Amino acid sequence: MMRLSRNLRRCRWLVFTGWLLALVPAVYLAMTQSGNLTGGGFEVAGSQSLLVHDQLDAHYPDRGAPALALVAAPRPDASYQDIDNAVALLRQIASELPGVTEAPNPTQRPPQPDRPYVVSLRLDARNAGTSDVAKKLRDRIGVKGDQSGQTANGKVRLYVIGQGALSAAAAANTKHDIANAERWNLPIILMVLVAVFGSLAAAAIPLALAVCTVVITMGLVFVLSMHTTMSVFVTSTVSMFGIALAVDYSLFILMRYREELRCGRRPPDAVDAAMATSGLAVVLSGMTVIASLTGIYLINTPALRSMATGAILAVAVAMLTSATLTPAVLATFARAAAKRSALVHWSRRPASTQSWFWSRWVGWVMRRPWITALAASTVLLVMAAPATLMVLGNSLLRQFDSSHEIRTGAAAAAQALGPGALGPVQVLVRFDAGGASAPEHSQTIAAIRHRIAQAPNVVSVAPPRFADDNGSALLSAVLSVDPEDLGARDTITWMRTQLPRVAGAAQVDVGGPTALIKDFDDRVSATQPLVLVFVAVIAFLMLLISIRSVFLAFKGVLMTLLSVAAAYGSLVMVFQWGWARGLGFPALHSIDSTVPPLVLAMTFGLSMDYEIFLLTRIRERFLQTGQTRDAVAYGVRTSARTITSAALIMIAVFCGFAFAGMPLVAEIGVACAVAIAVDATVVRLVLVPALMAMFDRWNWWLPRWLAHILPSVDFDRPLPKVDLGDVVVIPDDFAAAIPPSADVRMVLKSAAKLKRLAPDAICVTDPLAFTGCGCDGKALDQVQLAYRNGIARAISWGQRPVHPVTVWRKRLAVALDALQTTTWECGGVQTHRAGPGYRRRSPVETTNVALPTGDRLQIPTGAETLRFKGYLIMSRNSSHDYADFADLVDTMAPETAAAVLAGMDRYYSCQAPGRQWMATQLVGRLADPQPSDLGDQSPGADAQAKWEEVRRRCLSVAVAMLEEAR
């Protein structure tokens, strides 16, 4: 990964160009090809319903339920003339579309003002897709969003119903839902990212990658939709996964990049190190999610297959953007991605202090592992218990609100023709030798028809119709219940059990809309255990390769199963039991049958993100120390904040779709949000450390023969050590405020100016590098201890420690002031007119420091800053210099300042002959400060008190210098 990262950094403009070239056609496809998505795709290969459907298409061109229908629903004040005009208008609109004809319906009564009227339509071969025709019809009758069309006088409402209309309405709804969800998601994600990174520039990087991921994936989906069945719900899946994973993956890498910068690495090296660790974890996690989602293909239905394909594409593109675009972006905007802004850093407590909370937390958990593990497991099992009462169903119509025009149109058609008229049960009777209409088969067909009439919920059975090849007979039964009602499914089950008993040698297949849905649900229920086993095995193998531990891989799979079970339980509580009705979630009789397998594969894959990210961090530490408890504490301490932030983002994304989406999307959103929340908290932060503390060395058990078989990953190779040399690095646990961006900018500018003014400066070790970061004379370690113990909340803002960058800015300001007050070249000097002439005898002493942005630069040492300020006192004798000097010595012991200033004569000498040594003169100035501008100060009592404090501090240093001279 490090080699790949280096290549991507070098060729970053080529990387940007490649992704830009992928974006352009994706945007075009999104604008032109979205109409290819369908609301169907629930056919099951080899099922009776699909066989009947195919036979009807092949041999019964004029039979079956109408593809589309137009409905005129009169209002109470409508007249005969109004309904007649409305029906005539619908027939005229239908006749204007090529390939659309009216299908006669013998059960339809003449138009009446107290009853809706249905105009059934058929489409010929020129209209392969009913969705496009439905869109045209909806536009022509005036359907707007979820509102029906109406006649000119508004007395008759107009609707389009049928499978094509459902697809068109679902496509419009999902587009609207995605827009609503993103209006909710993006601001929340931005707020979380700004809180995490403390910088709008850094927060913009994951959002930009998320947008790129979603747009490109949508383009790929629309390309596939031109060649295969793609469900309308795939767009919601792509948007959910694309945003959540792209943001999460880039967040992992950016957080590690900043951590490597804090360790002292230069920005290019920090990028490579982040990619070799978090970048590799992202790739492994993405591959695990993709492998888990392939389990959906075992169900082998077009709808689920298309949704899995969309999710897989979203994961793959998110993984690729994170692994390729992130290094290129960091190479281009390294400083912007690294720095934090005090303006958007909302908490006064620094981010680094959070690790101490997690350190104490994991220590508390590991000291009582049995209790915490038992408590966490109990919570998960209680959450999972309602899953045993889950009822599965499937209804595209019920994905719409009850007031939606597609629902009210279907209700009007049911009122006109009966609830089961638009979805009759279709019984196909086949004879091996053909001749279905032959007299010898009439008795068999009559017996089957008689038996159908005895089935529950059957209202009428139409006379048999024969295939154009005379190989089969079709019997249509109209039910008294809606085709999507659970009672209709009972009828299908009864027919499939009873009809073969009276069919003799004939083959009986039961189809129709209800049978189609039932076959789909049965296939999902039958194959879900297989999907579970497949996904669990894939996850186990990926964890085994990543972590090289049998126990940890098994534990990871088991913990994820608990998270999935808790998510299933939440579905029952929220939707079946209606506990969240107050939040706007509808109470449903059943959970959509597509949701459990999708949630299983999705959450299994997503949970592996945190499992791999946490355990690889623990393993990385274990390889260095060999101590399990230390490795667990370190892994949780360094990754808990990242995991929590990533989980918050993912939960926000899923909740956005849950609140804005159709019931199927809402169910997926709720389940995934609960699974991620449980996994990132109860599992990763309680069960993982507790179980690892229980099993200690067994955590790393791996048979020798298996170790030789497993492929090696880069986690086993330690990162190159940071070559700091004499560079001063800000401690990772430094308890200080975030440096203001202005300070960072000024330090960079001032350091560059210092290099020009003092080109012969030398670098030395600076024991006073962090002097001034503590307040009121506190040592740095005391201030750190206060923060670690939580005392910092009681410290006023004025007493809080100062960030080293702010201190270094002040040092550079003093140095530039002194260097611009006088200049020297080869011993030459230009003296200030207000004071005696002094000559610099030795080069300026500086030290190398590393900023949080990764920049390395030279600043004056703490001792040199004191000498510069002493020089300014002697040169200008201003009250401002005395006050600055007092502030400098206030951060250290007077003896320390005296030891530095006592050696002034090695750095400066007096130009005038016969003058005293500079250190001796400085003692006199400090013992009795008499600045030349003392009369210009404010005469107030506060100013006088402050000046007396300055005199006291200067005197303490003068006394210490005299003591030093003894």
From Swiss-Prot:
The keyword Glycosyltransferase does not apply. It holds the Pfam family MMPL. The keyword Transmembrane helix applies. InterPro entries: MMPL_dom (IPR004869), Mycobact_MmpL (IPR050545), SSD (IPR000731). PANTHER family: MEMBRANE PROTEIN MJ1562-RELATED, MEMBRANE PROTEIN YDFJ. Belongs to the resistance-nodulation-cell division (RND) (TC 2.A.6) family. MmpL subfamily. This is Heme uptake protein MmpL11. It comes from Mycobacterium tuberculosis (strain ATCC 25618 / H37Rv).
